[in-house]
């Protein structure tokens, strides 16, 4: 759904990376973990430094306490694991701010990559470069406990309700393409605005990725005594959506990042991070199409 970023800090800036070969490999050779470590440690790509950006605020379970640099939360932990396997020290990873809805616009990017629950979609891929998937996504419905929508369990049952969501998100796309409500979904500039509309009963429900939805229902939408006011109605079957790191179009670093992601999957690190930070979300019931 959203985004974060790493800014190149070497002699070659992010704007100069397009078309650069990785390490000693030629432009037609597939990079290896060893060649990528060499390329990143040298001045060929980033002189061993990466600057990462994400939105503000960021949410549990992707980040914790709105502090991307603490290594807590799925996306923060993943970034540092990725940096480590590519030979970048934790102290050489810097974080910066990038609004979600501007991350996937065309043009120069002042970061290495952006991580903020950004879904790899065909339209976005026309103007930016995406990494391989680091998380496969299900969308789910969040509603206030007293709303009748909480008893609905299929897309057909949901059509008569008022949905709302943040502009540019795949949650909003899911509402329009799969739920197809009879009332046009209301669109908000930020997710916080959509949540406020839900709390004030201007809308009946929001569609977000399952982990974000679980956090909203259990910890974000609460009363003065922190009792949950909302519930996660259920999650939809997968439609092939996944989250990827976002790069400036043609950024050569993406090839090395893909090598790193593959290595984290192969050695079990990504699975361990998933179990630690997202394990409880596998039990959310699935809604019928």
PLM regions: where:
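Acidic, polar ligand-binding/catalytic clefts
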Residues: 92-157
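Alpha-to-beta junction loops
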Residues: 88, 108-118, 161-162, 200-212, ...
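Extended ligand-binding regions for polar small-molecule ligands
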Residues: 30-31, 76-80, 85, 169, ...
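Secretory targeting and sorting signals
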Residues: 1-27
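Bilobed "Venus flytrap"/periplasmic-binding protein-like clamshell domains
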Residues: 71-85, 118-120, 136-195, 210-215, ...
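A ligand-binding cleft/hinge motif common to bilobed small-molecule-binding domains
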Residues: 102, 118-126, 176-177, 204-239
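Extracytoplasmic small-molecule ligand-binding "clamshell" domains
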Residues: 31-114
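Periplasmic-binding protein-like
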Residues: 136-143, 218-259, 280-289
């Amino acid at each position: 759904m959203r985004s974060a970023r790493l800014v190149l800090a070497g002699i070659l800036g992010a704007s100069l990376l397009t078309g650069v070969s990785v390490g000693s490999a030629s432009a037609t050779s597939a990079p290896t973990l060893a060649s990528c470590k060499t390329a990143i440690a040298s001045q060929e790509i980033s002189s061993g430094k990466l600057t990462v950006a994400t939105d503000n605020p960021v949410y549990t379970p992707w980040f914790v306490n709105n502090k991307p640099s603490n290594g807590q939360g799925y996306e923060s932990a993943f970034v540092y694991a990725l940096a480590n396997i590519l030979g970048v020290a934790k102290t050489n990873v810097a974080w910066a701010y990038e609004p979600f809805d501007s991350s996937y616009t065309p043009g120069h990017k002042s970061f290495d990559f952006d991580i903020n629950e950004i879904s790899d979609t065909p339209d976005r891929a026309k103007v930016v470069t995406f990494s391989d998937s680091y998380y496969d996504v299900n969308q789910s419905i969040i509603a206030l406990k007293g709303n009748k929508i909480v008893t609905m369990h299929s897309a057909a049952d949901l059509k008569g309700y008022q949905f709302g969501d943040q502009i540019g998100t795949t949650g909003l796309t899911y509402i329009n393409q799969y739920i197809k409500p009879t009332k046009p979904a209301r669109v908000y500039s930020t997710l916080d605005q959509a949540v406020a509309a839900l709390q004030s009963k201007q809308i009946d429900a929001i569609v977000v990725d399952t982990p974000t939805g679980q956090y909203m229902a259990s910890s974000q939408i609460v009363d003065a005594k922190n009792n949950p006011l909302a519930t996660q109605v259920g999650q939809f079957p997968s439609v092939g959506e996944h989250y990827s790191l976002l790069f400036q179009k043609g950024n050569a670093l993406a090839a090395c990042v893909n090598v790193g992601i593959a290595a984290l999957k192969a050695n079990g690190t990504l699975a361990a991070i998933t179990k630690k930070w997202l394990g409880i979300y596998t039990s959310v019931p699935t809604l019928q199409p």
